[in-house]
Amino acid sequence: MSLTKSLLLALLAVVALAGVSAERARYDNYRLYKANAENAEQLAVLKQLESSSDSILFLDGVHIVGADVKMVVAPHKVPDLLEILGKAEIKYLLQSSDVQKTMDEIDEKVAMKGRAGEAYNWAQYYELDDTYAWLQTLAIENPGVVTLIEGGKTYQGRSILGVKITKSGKEKPGIFLEAGIHAREWIAPAAATYIINQLLTSEVEAVKQLAENYTWYVLPHANPDGYVYTHTTDRMWRKTRTPYQGCFGADPNRNWAFHWNEVGASSNPCSDTYAGPSAFSEIETLSLSNYLASLKGKIQLYISLHAYSQYLLYPYGHTGDLPDNVADFRKVYDVSIAAVNKRYGTTYTGGNIYDAIYPAAGASVDWAYGTQDVRMAFCYELRPSSNSFITGFKLPAAQIVPASEELLDSIVAMAAEVNNLGYFN
């Protein structure tokens, strides 16, 4: 059976699976607090809260002193939380007294299911099966240019579907773009599909060169099960959907076999940063890593899309030690964040993962750089900034296009500088 036919059958299975009803999680009267640990003792208190309570959803990892940590807190848990914070003298700020109301005020605008094949666009977000149908259509309409690829499988049997784009008609240096590994970060897959479309249709000379000079591998959804769950059940879901000891899922961006679970991850299955019981315990990361390994030597630039906070990051996440080619990373970083700023004045910051944002071992970019001879690997944390929206994972649909445009501007500059430095030779 051809890949196209087998994937069509898989898509039918996905549609059937997505139809199973589930009660949607709501956050009525949940509070959103921002706390900041000023010393190691206070940090330990927050870490204990993160590991022991299923009534507090941590939107940020609890890893370093001085970093803001946002917490969504169930109404019945608020008195206990405030007592604990008070005793530890941890400073906090109430940012929302009704998280559900705050979320409802943001117009994400999800497309009506089944309409993607007619007019897929970037004025709205799409469910998984509609995006997969669109990718299938691209492969049919662009023979010899777009090839449907299966980057892996999921616990629930879905395909990690993407496209390979060879606009020149022959193999060129490779760029791999992975998005959506964290399920709730909807802007990441949307931006990935925008880039696919621009590579195929743009008349802008710099974008045409980007399409023609490189072989592209783009996977908009590296965590399909989790993404489906954000549409059917819990908009704030982050992890995979593998069952573990009364809780579900591991953090797929803490599960890669490169300094796995050394720092910046949790061993608690109920934590949003649960690293899994072992490296590559998740079918998603294991199968995707196998696919990437099959491309070893063909990929020179790896890009991972996340949200939010407007960062551009490079290895490492497990240590403050810097890559041996850090001088080149900094050159690429400088031109890339300058480019992202030009169109709309959007400000990105960043640097090496460990120091710029927080320790995070077991990430995909570190694995690609550390084990696959991919000498340039970057992670974008897209819009909004950390202070722009209370629920930063819910970016209004009206911002999909501008966020994606400035990202593409940045990637154009990034690829040019990586080429200037000789990495595509």
Curated annotation (Swiss-Prot):
The active site is at 381 (proton donor/acceptor). PROSITE patterns: CARBOXYPEPT_ZN_1 (PS00132), PEPTIDASE_M14 (PS52035). It is found in: Secreted. It comes from the Eukaryota. Its EC number is 3.4.17.-. Its cofactor is Zn(2+). GO terms for molecular function: metallocarboxypeptidase activity; zinc ion binding. Its main location: secreted. Residues 124-418 form the Peptidase M14 domain. Zn(2+) binds at residues 182, 185, 306. SUPFAM superfamilies: Protease propeptides/inhibitors (SSF54897), Zn-dependent exopeptidases (SSF53187). Disulfide bonds join 247-270. Belongs to the peptidase M14 family. This is Zinc carboxypeptidase A 1.
